[in-house]
Amino acid sequence: LTPGKIIDYGLRDSMNMGACMAPAAADTIRQHFEDFGTSPDDYDKIVTGDLGKVGQRVLLDLLQTSGIDLGERHMDCGIEIYDCKKQDTHAGGSGCGCSAAVLCGPLLRDMHEGKIRRMIFAGTGAMMSPTSVQQSQPIAGICHAVVLERSGA
């Protein structure tokens, strides 16, 4: 378990929550590697909750500046929940349902089938309310991460 901390980059656009949450995800993932002495190569997948395409790009750029390249290991549930080519979803899905559906569906199935042995699952969240959005207050992000590992053969 890697508990995250609230990260506020001062972003105020409630229509771009992925970018608001990405700095928290980057901080938590970076902290996880530091705390456990691991690197992206130690995991089959590094999964975030619902950053979408824009937030994913921010996450990857922030980690790259720290010398961390997630490469093809990164997956975002907000992107995976839709077929963006067929469904015109723009940035992808948003909300905790993305994490739940993708984790409990394809990810755990792939673990059961042995396609994924070890993954970081980093749930993302935005700290906001209707009132804070109406008042144009900054939207902070939070992210906590767990490692899921397949036991046995």
Briefly describe each language-model feature range.
Residues 28-42, 110-111:
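Phosphate/pyrophosphate-binding loops at sites that engage ATP/ADP/AMP, CoA/4′-phosphopantetheine
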Residues 99-100, 105-135:
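Internal helix-turn-beta structural module
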Residues 51-66, 131-138:
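Short glycine/threonine-rich loop-to-helix capping motif typified by GTGT followed
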Residues 2-7, 47-53, 125-126:
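Glycine-rich beta-alpha junction loops
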Residues 21, 37-40, 47-57:
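A structural signal for small-residue-enriched, beta-sheet-centric alpha/beta enzyme cores
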Residues 5, 65-102:
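Conserved catalytic cysteine-centered active-site region
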Residues 15, 19-26, 53, 97-101, ...:
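Electropositive phosphate-/nucleotide-binding environments in soluble metabolic enzymes
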Residues 1-30, 35, 72-79, 88, ...:
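Condensing-enzyme catalytic core mediating Claisen C-C bond formation in acyl metabolism
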